[in-house]
Amino acid sequence: MATLFWLIVFLGACFALIYNRVELRLSTAILGAVLVAFTSFSGAGLFWLFILWVLFGGFALLNVEALRRERLSAPILDVLKKLLPRLSDTERAALEAGSVWWEGELFSGMPDWRQLTRLPAPKLTEAEQAFLDGPTEELCSLAEEWPITHDLQDMPEPVWDFIREKGFFSLIIPEEYGGKGFSPLAISMILAKLASHTGTTSTTVGVPNSLGPAELLLHYGTEEQKQRWLPGLASAQEIPCFALTSIHAGSDATGLVDSGVVCKGEFDGEEIIGIRLNWDKRYITLAPVATVLGLAFKLYDPDHLIGDRDEYGITAALIPTDLPGVEIGNRHLPIGIPFQNGPTRGKDVFVPLDCIIGGKEMAGEGWRMLVELLSAGRGIVLPSNAVGGAMAAVYATGAYARIRRQFKVPISEFHGIGEALARMTGYTYIMTAASRVTCTALNEGEKPAVPTAILKYHNTEMSRRVANDAMD
């Protein structure tokens, strides 16, 4: 009986040390003391005591760092390297993109919640609040979903004019280039407000203020490119889109086959070294009405005109849509929502090297650009649209449940209906809170890749569940 008791004490000590992640040397001392007590009082046989002391001796040797690394860590690492697939450069770029924010505490296993509560809550500036209360509310009153969706299959011209006039396409562009220079929180709240009224408007406004020509130029463009394009984008004289999705690759961005070959050609009457582009993209929002096309393609230089490499990889460039060979105008109709979305094609389109965002020095850096900017951008547009859609569903469903009566009682009084309404409200609260706390990081200049990816998935998924409950 004594042996069983001390065995339980010994195993309990091992479990407690592991659970609390006690430092190795202290763990060794504690286990040694417990083993001495076990040897003295348990009455166990010499054979089992010998086994336990041998195991403890092996454990104690782990305190010799050089020996541990050479005899244990290195062989285990070699085995794991052979078992794990080799990371490609594109995969490594995706994994290393962005920054680590408070979520690092979560993944440590021992998060400091006080650190989260000490973070400053993001607030709107006076200009941002005025824009949310003024032009955003006006746009909601102008854009009526029924005629947009069922009669016009587009936003009416007064709505387009209002969006241009009030600078809705320039929310992320700094004031020095004619934009609003709003914070991520402000953009998130503006898009959520628009999405609570009409998905067409929120999507149309969201695209120029997310991953696209303006954001790429702000982070990677040359000063000449910024001066050339940003004022026009801010005033909406230029309508941007970003063509990433290849018809052959879909969401596998690294598998795109759209190509650009460095060669000599004629541009504006002069023979220059440029890029001859061929692409076939689809599901590109704003492509049917775009004047400038952000294009992702794979760059090749078979004649080594710009360097000693044959292939540079994914590259991002800005292409005016009025160039010969560029095809836009056709439309898709995603799930019946008539925001401008469609295919774009290019056949032997010749452009100068300075169309590459950041200049020719950034050739082949397109994938890195995209994954770094996605680390922040995906935490704003889709999550905000999901919040706005969920809010609209909760408002409409809750009101309907109060005025719709069955058996002389509002259906909101029925437990089944009340349960669905409670679930919808809870999901909407979670989505809103998650968006706000993520905007806290974005407002501080962080690019938290993991939280934004989690937020994008869960907000859209919870929005789908809210929609299901609303329809039920």
Task: Cite the ranges covered by each PLM segment.
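Amphipathic, small/basic residue-rich leader segments at the start of a protein or domain
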Residues: 5-17, 26-38, 47, 51-208, ...
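Alpha-helix capping/hinge segments and adjacent helical runs
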Residues: 103, 447-472
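Beta-sandwich/jelly-roll carbohydrate-recognition scaffolds of carbohydrate-active enzymes
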Residues: 228-231, 245-270, 282, 302-304
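Internal maturation/activation junctions in enzymes
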Residues: 231-258, 439-446, 452
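A short core secondary-structure module
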Residues: 270-327
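Catalytic nucleotidyl-transfer cores of nucleotide-processing enzymes
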Residues: 291, 299, 323-348
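A glycine-rich, basic-preceded beta-loop-alpha segment at the flavin cofactor/substrate interface
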Residues: 329, 343-378, 395-412
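Extended amphipathic alpha-helical segments enriched in small hydrophobics
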Residues: 378-445
